[in-house]
Amino acid sequence: MKLIILTGLVLFAIVSLIEAEEESGRACILLYGECTKASGSCCSNLICDCYRKLKKGVQIARQCFCLEKDVVYKKHI
């Protein structure tokens, strides 16, 4: 009985370590990188900011980019 419990604990520890390694190995998205499909993947000092692409007032697309936190971008005409 002790052997079964010990084996289960060892397997649980191995699976936990593998999952933790996979999560820490993921690369974050750098400044101005597209994060449309992965909104939580920007590097720690960045935020995923999304914009609607309009054509004649109708939304045709949505694009997201990793941008600096607390920075406002304005369009110059």
Swiss-Prot record:
Molecular function as annotated in GO: toxin activity
Keyword set includes Disulfide bond: yes
Family to which the UniProt record says this protein belongs: Belongs to the neurotoxin 19 (CSTX) family. 10 (U11-Lctx) subfamily.
Proregion residues excised on maturation: 21-26
Tissue expression as described in the entry: Expressed by the venom gland.
Keyword Ribonucleoprotein among UniProt keywords: no
Source organism: Lycosa singoriensis
Pfam families per the UniProt record, alphabetical: Toxin_35
Localisation per UniProt entry: Secreted
Post-translational modification: Contains 4 disulfide bonds.
Name of the protein in question: U11-lycotoxin-Ls1a
Cysteine disulfide partners in this protein: none
Signal peptide start-end: 1-20
Lineage top rank: taxon: Eukaryota
Keywords: Disulfide bond, Secreted, Signal, Toxin
Alphabetized InterPro entries for the sequence: Spider_toxin_CSTX_knottin
GO cellular component: extracellular region
